[in-house]
């Protein structure tokens, strides 16, 4: 992505019409939308939503209702974000003490790799991506930084088919 003043660009998604690009800013702790002009240039960055303590947006997927699904590796959260920025927590597997320590490090400017690698949880191991799959696109698969498997859960909303499934050259 070619844009200024981005707080560590991570995953991105295009809207269905190809007019907007959504970007997770991990250390900016926000989801930003850019307009895309007819030449493919980005403009008018707008913060769709900001995330609070413990949420460092990483993975990004879109469902058929044009809501965005955000993963956060430090807190093992999956958050569904509506087009107006409203957030719904879908799942979380985190340790409050660890999140408090990470928040102190983040605000003090000393947050580093160790804060991602030492996340404490019951089952999930630093979820970093989400993809919808299965015959009805209602199985949400979770990739992780430290796990040795792929967790999944049934989604109440169907995921949007990836653009490349219907891309013609």
Feature annotation, model-predicted:
Residues 1-20, 50-69, 75, 99-101, ...:
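Beta-rich, blade/repeat-based domains predominating
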Residues 13-34, 38, 42:
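Glycine- and Gly-Pro-enriched alpha-helical subdomains that act as flexible
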Residues 29-32, 76-79, 148-151:
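Structural signal for beta-propeller blades
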Residues 26, 36, 73, 135, ...:
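Short loop/turn segments immediately following the C-termini of beta-strands
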Residues 34-41, 83-89, 93-95, 154-164:
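Short loop/turn segments immediately following beta-strands, especially the blade-tip
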Residues 78, 84-108:
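Internal, charge-rich low-complexity segments
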Residues 1, 44-47, 86-88:
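Predominantly a core beta-strand signature of beta-propeller blades
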Residues 124-169:
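Blade-level signature of beta-propeller repeat domains, shared across WD40, Kelch, NHL, RCC1
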